[in-house]
């Protein structure tokens, strides 16, 4: 056995974080929400205390551009706001040229203000690709069940058992059952049973790669079986075994890209092409994945307009992105303590031997990707940000945290 690999490649979507408002447990069946609420109330063990900005109720979350500016879009003709653009250029002066960013202040939804820095530069998206997966699942649901009540029933009542698609993923997810003395964080295991809401929650809150692969497979199965979903285990097994790999790959890609392109997202600028786990990738061969800040920002704009599938889906996805536990990376900036943050992050680091340098998580010396996508609601200001970077040997988590504070101060200082 080698004591050291010549390089280490690690896909890290996130350290533990949670999403969806705490009052959503009864409607969704996301059991860990009950556990976290009981921790907050001091009724079960746990030291987790949420920041002020993480305590919104479900009815306080809404879409800011829906009905207020439905036609707005970001493209090469979008003017840069002079104040914000100067501020962004000042923030990034002297920083690594791998940084790229797109920023939109929608505090006045009728008059969005835009700034950017190399917004068209594409990088591997890492776990930001899970935004494509959640779009794919909600799109498949809408096509098979136009009724919102029917979609809610499918999300809540469909129980999916973890299978070999979960391997390998070292991340943990929060497990809570009624009557438990505590919420337990552990890896997803074969035979674990969660409803679709819970699988989505694990994918977007814990950024579980196991959940990401399981959810993507469900989107494929809904596309294949329609109203006959969920298929019996034997039918699912036969489908994955007997369909040619090229057809499976095409179906997997179409399951994500159909609702994305319907929303106006450019697949040449935002694509998830490969599953998150090794076993899933072996079962369904993939293709290239990429993203750029400009298209990620457009995804956020479409979300706020209610155009990611439809208004109901957009609002539910936004709730799933709501950050409701002690924060990390971009969202952990002290400047955002009181802000509501809807957040997804992704990272990928790669190490190679280098005398005198200790390579590790967030500090890769061959690759050190860190990406952040956020909707920030801070006082009277509301803004959308997509940022990507590849700063070698720097603690990229701390860097994004620092930049988040600088952007928050820029937004708050804007006249008007």
What residues fall within each predicted segment?
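Sec-exported extracytoplasmic/periplasmic mature domains
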Residues: 93, 134-146, 204-209, 216-224, ...
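Short, conserved catalytic-motif segment at the N-terminal edge
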Residues: 93-123
């Amino acid at each position: 056995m080698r004591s050291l690999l010549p390089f280490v490649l690690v896909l890290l979507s996130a350290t533990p974080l949670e999403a969806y408002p705490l009052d959503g447990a009864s409607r969704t069946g996301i059991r860990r929400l009950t556990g976290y609420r009981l921790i907050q109330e001091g009724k079960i063990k746990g030291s987790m205390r949420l920041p002020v900005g993480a305590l919104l109720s479900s009815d306080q979350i809404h879409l800011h551009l829906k009905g207020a500016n439905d036609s707005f879009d970001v493209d090469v003709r979008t003017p840069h706001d002079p104040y914000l653009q100067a501020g962004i250029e000042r923030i990034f002066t002297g920083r690594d040229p791998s940084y790229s960013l797109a920023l939109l202040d929608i505090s006045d939804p009728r008059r969005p203000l835009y700034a950017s820095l190399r917004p068209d530069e594409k990088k591997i998206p890492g776990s930001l690709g899970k935004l494509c997966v959640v779009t794919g699942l909600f799109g498949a649901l809408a096509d098979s069940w136009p009724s919102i009540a029917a979609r809610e029933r499918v999300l809540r009542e469909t129980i999916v058992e973890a299978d070999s698609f979960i391997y390998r993923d070292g991340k943990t997810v929060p497990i809570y059952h009624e009557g438990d003395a505590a919420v337990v964080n552990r890896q997803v295991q074969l035979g674990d049973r969660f409803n679709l809401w819970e699988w989505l929650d694990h994918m977007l809150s814990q950024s579980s790669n196991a959940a990401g692969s399981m959810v993507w497979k469900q989107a494929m199965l809904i596309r294949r079986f329609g109203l006959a979903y969920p298929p019996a285990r034997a039918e699912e097994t036969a489908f994955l075994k007997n369909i040619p790999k090229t057809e499976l790959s095409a179906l997997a890609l179409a399951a994500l890209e159909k609702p994305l392109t319907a929303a106006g997202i450019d697949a040449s600028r935002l694509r998830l092409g490969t599953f998150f786990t090794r076993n899933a990738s072996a079962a369904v061969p993939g293709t290239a994945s990429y993203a750029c800040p400009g298209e990620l920002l457009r995804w956020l704009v479409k979300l706020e307009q209610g155009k990611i599938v439809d208004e109901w889906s957009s609002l539910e996805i936004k709730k799933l992105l709501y950050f409701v536990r002690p924060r990390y990376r971009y969202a952990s900036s002290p400047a955002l303590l009181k802000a509501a943050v809807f957040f997804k992050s992704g990272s990928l680091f790669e190490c190679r031997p280098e005398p005198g340098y200790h390579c590790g998580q967030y500090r890769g010396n061959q690759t050190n990707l860190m990406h952040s996508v956020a909707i920030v609601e801070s006082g009277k200001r509301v803004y959308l940000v997509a940022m990507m970077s590849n700063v070698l040997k720097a603690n990229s988590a701390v860097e994004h945290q620092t930049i988040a504070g600088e952007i928050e101060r820029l937004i708050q200082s804007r006249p008007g």
